[in-house]
Amino acid sequence: MNEALLALDRGDLATAQRLMGSAVEVPEAGQGIGFLQMHEGKYADAVRSFGNTPSNALAIAQIMQGQYADATRTLAAVAQPNGETAYLKAVVAARTNDLQGLISNLRSAIAQDSSYALRAQRDLEFAAFSQTPEFVALVK
């Protein structure tokens, strides 16, 4: 399984697929297969592969499917939320036109890791909000 994830990280999808196929009996295989499916743009399949365990990865697949309510529930249930969790909540807020949710969650992400400020400045997810005073003040 680890070799498959390393191949996926290198962009070697063929090797990752081959190695994932031989690792389906491994308990963590669903996560690895879900990552592979996300790289292939198969987000609905990835959601199924990730299963019911709340994770940032599951939320990303749900966001890419337009399942914002599901992604919100998933992110709220992540066992150990981190800056990425807060950033993803901000993405969901942006996609649902919730400026206050965007600002609140982006503030939390930046408080945990200041690099999220620069990332948010460049992220097209926030383009519609990039000129609002609240957003500008937060990411400066």
Q: Which positions does each model-derived feature cover?
A:
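N-terminal leader/linker segments that initiate helical-solenoid repeat arrays
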Residues: M1-E3, A7
